[in-house]
Structures are given as structure tokens and as C-alpha cells.
């Protein structure tokens, strides 16, 4: 079957960025997949949160199905839906606590915000639907993202699911889509829409200094940027 999309190179050989078009295709493939609703929900929630937060996959998912590192794995009480006021309007966000961010070895971790977007890739909407339809009890001491059988949803399992869903969309021999494609995807999209290197580095926390700037940037400013990005995604999809 002819592949529909050729994802864009991120600057590293063999590494490709997720695009809004492929996110749209992924959502369509999930609807057609025949997977149980709870499984579709978890795949889409992880996808949208990784894109919107420019997260590394093991900042959100466990490395092992039957065990986890309490010092680094995201657990149920690490994510909360909250409100933020932006230009006099209240917008929802996910407050995500990263226990062990790569950029800084902070014993207390750090909290980042992922804001609602109102488009088809809205991470708040995806998260709430997954939480509503999850078939496991969300116990605070346990990893947040777990499957129906109780095992942890791992980065490896996520990559495997992406490949099954997108194998007829992208050429995996030439342009594989992996969990890290979401993080690269946001940076690529921002660059195409004329955001400065400083803004891109700050939102993606690409090095220690950018990490410090992210923390120093007021929450309202980050919310406004998320709103602008959502508008650009919507316009981009209309023109595609």
C-alpha cells in the first residue's frame, strides 16, 4: 500500500517528527483499529500529552510492565487538572510533576503545565476521556498509565502500538514514527511557524538553561503560547 505521509526530518539521520497530519491519521486509525475503548484512550492520551508537553516518553510512561522506579516513574498523583487565568479567561491545564527531569538533577523534581487547546489534539480532553474510561483503579502509589490487566503501559509498548497503527501511513523503513517523534514534532511545528529559537528551547526544555527559563516564565505566558499554537494547528489543518 502506498504510504500517505513522509514525516519531516528532525535534523538527526533517521529521526522524524510527528506532524498534525499524522496525528490526525493516528486518531483515524485508532477509530478503525478494533481496539478496546480503554486502549484507544490511553494511546491517544499519551500521544497528545507528549506532543503538547514536548515530553520524553519515560517522563510519562514506565520502563517495565510489572515494576517501576518510584523515583522517576509518573504516578497517579503526579498529574492534576487545574485552572489558569489567561487574558481574563479561565483555561484548563494539566499540572504534571516530573520526578526526575533529564535537564536538572533536582531531588524534588519540577512541575510543568500542559494547557487545553480546543482542537482535535487537546491533551486535557484526551486525558479526561482516558481517565473516565480506564479499566484500572487509579491508585496513587502506582504508575498513572496502566492497562486493563493492571500492568504498566511502557514506552516500548507505546512504540509497538504506534507502529501497528501507522504502518500504512508512514514508511517505517525510511521514516519511522516513535515516541520521541512527538517531542521533535512540537519543535518542528514551532520553527515552521516562526517562533524564536529561545521560545522553542524553553518550551521543549532542551538544555539546562532552557529548563531554567521555562520555570521562570509565568504560567500565564506559557498558557498564551499554547493558545497561539493551537490556533496555528487549526489553521494549518484547514489548509492541508
Which positions does each model-derived feature cover?
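Extended, non-catalytic subsegments within catalytic or DNA/protein-binding/adaptor domains
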Residues: 1-240
Amino acid at each position: 500500500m502506498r504510504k500517505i505521509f513522509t514525516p519531516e526530518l528532525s535534523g538527526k539521520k533517521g529521526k522524524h517528527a510527528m506532524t498534525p497530519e499524522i496525528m490526525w491519521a493516528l486518531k483515524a486509525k485508532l477509530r478503525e483499529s478494533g481496539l478496546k475503548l480503554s486502549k484507544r484512550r490511553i494511546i491517544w492520551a499519551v500521544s497528545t500529552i507528549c506532543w503538547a508537553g514536548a515530553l520524553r516518553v519515560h517522563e510519562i510512561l514506565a520502563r517495565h510492565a510489572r515494576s517501576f522506579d518510584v523515583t522517576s516513574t509518573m504516578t497517579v498523583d503526579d498529574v492534576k487538572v487545574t485552572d489558569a487565568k489567561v487574558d481574563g479567561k479561565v483555561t484548563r491545564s494539566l499540572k504534571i510533576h516530573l520526578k526526575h527531569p533529564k535537564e536538572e538533577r533536582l531531588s524534588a523534581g519540577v512541575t510543568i503545565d500542559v494547557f487545553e487547546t480546543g482542537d482535535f489534539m487537546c491533551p486535557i480532553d484526551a486525558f479526561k476521556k482516558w481517565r473516565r474510561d480506564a479499566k484500572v483503579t487509579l491508585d496513587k502509589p502506582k504508575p498513572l498509565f496502566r492497562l486493563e490487566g493492571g500492568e504498566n503501559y511502557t514506552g516500548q509498548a507505546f512504540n509497538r502500538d504506534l507502529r501497528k497503527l501507522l504502518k500504512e501511513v508512514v514508511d517505517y523503513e525510511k521514516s519511522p514514527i516513535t515516541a520521541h517523534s512527538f517531542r521533535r514534532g512540537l519543535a518542528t511545528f514551532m520553527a515552521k511557524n516562526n517562533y524564536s529559537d529561545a521560545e522553542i528551547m524553553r518550551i521543549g526544555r532542551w538544555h539546562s538553561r532552557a529548563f531554567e527559563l521555562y520555570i521562570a516564565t509565568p504560567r500565564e505566558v506559557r498558557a498564551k503560547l499554547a493558545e497561539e499554537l493551537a490556533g496555528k494547528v487549526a489553521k494549518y489543518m484547514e489548509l492541508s
